[in-house]
């Protein structure tokens, strides 16, 4: 590139973000340098602060700036229900829906032997220990409806077989307002298998 090494370094650094290629990184860098210097300074400070201060909650593995996150600190959330998700963004989506009032465990991934991700890399033993220690009565497996997410859910369920815990899986199916002609076969199959009486 025909720019300063500092500009090149900024562009390369921005490329670490998901979905950001060379051109997008250049546009971002040029915007920050041309018109957004105060925003760029705030962004740099916030990044430094977050990278230094954000850790994983000791209880659920979600992002937190304290040993125990705000959700795990609330006694009313420890109601015997534990929801297992793959990522903090999944937890956030459930929280924003506003209906679930239990606690969480964030795997920070899913099983993927091809990528070298086994049970120990995503904290399965920590999850199983927590389930037993806290007397969880219902475990909601809210992993994504992908091959890896399904495999992860089945692995966890198999490990807890015979433990007298209700193990549930989030329903999969047709989105509200969706049309059958646009739904993929995998989703349609799950919708048929998870159908319920109309009276419910």
UniProtKB/Swiss-Prot annotation:
BP GO terms, sorted: DNA recombination; DNA repair
- Looking at the keywords, is Metal-binding present? yes
Q: Which residues form the Toprim domain?
A: 80-175
InterPro entries documented for this protein = DNA_Rcmb_RecR, Rcmb_RecR, Rcmb_RecR_Znf, TOPRIM_dom, TOPRIM_RecR
What PANTHER family does UniProt report for this protein, alphabetically? RECOMBINATION PROTEIN RECR (PTHR30446:SF0)
Q: What does this protein do?
A: May play a role in DNA repair. It seems to be involved in an RecBC-independent recombinational process of DNA repair. It may act with RecF and RecO.
Q: In its UniProt entry, what is this protein called? A: Recombination protein RecR
Q: Which organism is it from?
A: Marinobacter nauticus (strain ATCC 700491 / DSM 11845 / VT8)
Quick one: which gene encodes this?
Answer: recR
């Amino acid at each position: 590139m025909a720019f300063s090494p500092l500009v090149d370094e900024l562009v390369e650094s921005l490329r670490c973000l998901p979905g950001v290629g060379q051109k997008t990184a250049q546009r971002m860098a040029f915007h920050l340098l041309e018109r957004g210097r105060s925003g760029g300074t705030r962004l740099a400070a916030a990044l430094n602060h977050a990278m230094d201060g954000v850790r994983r909650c000791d209880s659920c593995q979600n992002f937190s700036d304290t040993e125990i996150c705000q959700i795990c600190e609330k006694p009313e959330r420890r109601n015997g229900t534990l929801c297992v998700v793959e990522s903090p963004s999944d937890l956030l989506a459930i929280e924003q829906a506003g209906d679930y009032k239990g606690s969480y465990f964030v795997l920070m991934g899913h099983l993927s032997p091809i990528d070298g991700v086994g049970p120990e890399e995503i904290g399965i033993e920590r999850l199983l220990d927590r389930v037993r220690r806290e007397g969880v009565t219902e475990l909601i497996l809210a992993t994504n409806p992908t091959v890896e997410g399904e495999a992860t859910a089945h692995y966890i369920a198999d490990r807890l077989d015979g433990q007298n815990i209700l193990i549930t899986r989030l329903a999969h199916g047709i989105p509200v307002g969706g049309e059958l002609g646009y739904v993929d076969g995998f989703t349609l199959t799950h919708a048929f298998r998870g159908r319920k009486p109309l009276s419910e």
